[in-house]
Amino acid sequence: MNRNSKIKWIAETAIFIALLITLQAVTKSMSQFVTGSMVNLVLITATLASGFASGLTVAAVSPFFAFMLGIGPKFIALVPFVALGNIVLVLVWGLLCKKGVEMKNMITALIIGALLKFVALYSGIVKFAIPTLLALPEKQAAVMGANFSL
């Protein structure tokens, strides 16, 4: 990767991150379905338009910006699992559509990406994070709760 292509990649990725933050802020008062759909649209568009690495970068930082804007999970411990779900979505779209953006590839990526993102979120949050947090002794849970309330 030469210098100009690195600069182009950084600029394109920054534009998608800025678009993502703007959409999250604008749709904050709307339903989570609207905000989540817009975020997924930006992730997929970043992957298809700017490449796999750009999509992965936007997918990884998206939930942290959502947390800072008060949109995403209320507990910071859940944010990495949302990032994992986003990364899974980008991986599916990147792998299935890398040979070309054809309708059958896009429909397949849409279905498989949604299912695998659900599996990643469900297994990460419901099966791992919440039981782990609930298993903490009372004093540790109180300290963590106080940290999360800040």
Language-model-detected regions and their locations in the chain:
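Loop-helix junctions at membrane interfaces
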Residues: 1-150
